[in-house]
């Protein structure tokens, strides 16, 4: 499971995550929790599976909240019985992360105020999309609770999200992602917007979409 999620920005509530963890424990299922977008939330903080189950596998990264995309650095929290097997597996892929990446990661823990300011910027851009996208005909979506994506139902506009996104790119220069990249069954009716770029770029993109939809 992923919380906050990509592409929806949905955050799994603590009681729901606890129920999932209990179900997995009862059924002998290994729970893997992708928590890469932890720290980027707009309401309550996202719960971690590590607090709910000693048997869960938690995957996280410095790429999102810590803005270290490209440094290829992350971590796992695993049950004791998996430590040795995972270490053996990892040693077949790499020896260790670069020292430079590790030193940078240590330094970034002292940058919380700046990082939280970046999250506040995401919130501002999210709120702009929530206000302005309906003016461009994108009015069927749930407000993202975390991450920096908005997943919109465009079934009122198209039944082919790939062709729809290609047309928008060709005619407006705005790049959005077709839902089929995330959901092969229902993705033709959805698109994903990202608001990880600057406020000026997001605002300009929305203006183009509004103008594009005008009769």
List where the protein language model places each region.
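PLP-dependent class I/II
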Residues: 1-215
């Amino acid at each position: 499971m992923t919380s906050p999620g990509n592409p929806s920005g949905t955050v799994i509530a603590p009681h729901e995550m606890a129920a999932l963890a209990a179900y997995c424990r009862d059924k002998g299922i290994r729970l893997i929790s992708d928590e890469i977008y932890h720290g980027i939330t707009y309401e309550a903080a996202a719960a971690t599976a590590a607090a709910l189950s000693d048997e869960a596998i938690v995957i996280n990264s410095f790429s999102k909240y810590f803005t270290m995309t490209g440094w290829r650095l992350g971590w796992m929290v695993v049950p004791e019985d998996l430590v040795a097997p995972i270490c053996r597996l990892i040693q077949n892929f790499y020896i260790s992360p670069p020292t430079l990446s590790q030193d940078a990661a240590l330094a970034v823990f002292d940058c919380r105020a700046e990082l939280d300011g970046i999250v506040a910027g995401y919130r501002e851009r999210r709120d702009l999309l929530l206000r302005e996208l309906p003016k461009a005909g994108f009015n069927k979506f749930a407000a993202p609770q975390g991450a920096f994506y908005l997943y919109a139902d465009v079934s009122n506009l198209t039944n082919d999200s790939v062709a729809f996104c290609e047309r928008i790119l060709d005619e407006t220069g705005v790049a959005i992602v077709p839902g089929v990249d995330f959901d092969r069954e229902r993705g033709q009716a959805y698109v994903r917007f990202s608001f990880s770029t600057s406020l000026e770029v997001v605002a300009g993109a929305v203006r183009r979409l509004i103008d594009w939809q005008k009769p």
